[in-house]
């Protein structure tokens, strides 16, 4: 189970009670907004980890500058992931954040990897899906996780969608597939 630290502060015990568990697998600081003392956050996360309340901790929506600040702090490099918006139509992190995380061996967690209903109606995704015998959603997810350093967390409303999405794990997009998607949804320019 995962949960995010919001405006109410670090409270995995409260979150655990709400979720019906005594520990969280991953606890995220959701936005840095106004937090100048990241060392206090890291110390709190490390204390929660040592107490067995959380198995890992990470951040959400941190840019490269925020990540550099975090990694300058003792134990800041124990951050398990950075959860950010990433999908075939929202590729801004490819410019700097994705390479930064890859260089440090830290996976990126992509939220909204399916990009919403309009992206799932994208003709390029549909064509590629038809060629591979799968859904546009499976293509979008396979695209998101193609580097091996991205974890996609799609929302799913049914068991059927979960099964459909799982196809992405065994789907290998061809260079032509990737070129077709780049033509419609170009990567950011450096």
Mark where each language-model region is.
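Short, acidic/polar
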Residues: 4-19, 40, 65-69, 94
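CE4/NodB-like, metal-dependent polysaccharide N-deacetylase domain
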Residues: 7-28, 47-51, 73
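Beta/alpha (TIM)-barrel catalytic core signal, keyed to glycine-rich beta->alpha loops juxtaposed to Asp/Glu
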Residues: 32-190
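Active-site mouth loops of central-metabolism enzymes
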Residues: 1-6, 30
């Amino acid at each position: 189970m995962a949960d995010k630290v919001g405006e109410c502060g670090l409270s995995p015990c409260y979150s655990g009670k709400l979720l019906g568990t005594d520990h969280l697998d991953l606890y995220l600081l959701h936005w840095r907004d106004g937090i100048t003392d990241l060392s206090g956050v890291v110390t709190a996360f490390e204390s929660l980890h040592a107490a067995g309340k959380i198995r890992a901790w990470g951040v959400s929506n941190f840019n490269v500058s925020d990540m550099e600040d975090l990694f300058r702090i003792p134990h800041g490099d124990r951050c398990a992931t950075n959860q950010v918006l990433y999908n075939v139509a929202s590729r801004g992190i490819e410019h700097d954040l994705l390479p930064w995380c890859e260089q440090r061996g830290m996976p990126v967690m992509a939220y909204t990897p399916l990009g919403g209903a309009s992206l799932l109606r994208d003709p390029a995704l549909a064509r590629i899906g038809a060629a591979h015998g799968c859904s546009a959603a499976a293509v979008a997810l396979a695209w998101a996780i193609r580097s091996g350093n991205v974890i996609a967390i799609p929302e799913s409303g049914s068991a059927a969608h979960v099964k459909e999405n799982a196809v992405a794990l065994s789907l290998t997009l061809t260079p032509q597939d990737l070129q077709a998607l780049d033509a419609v949804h170009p990567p950011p320019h450096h």
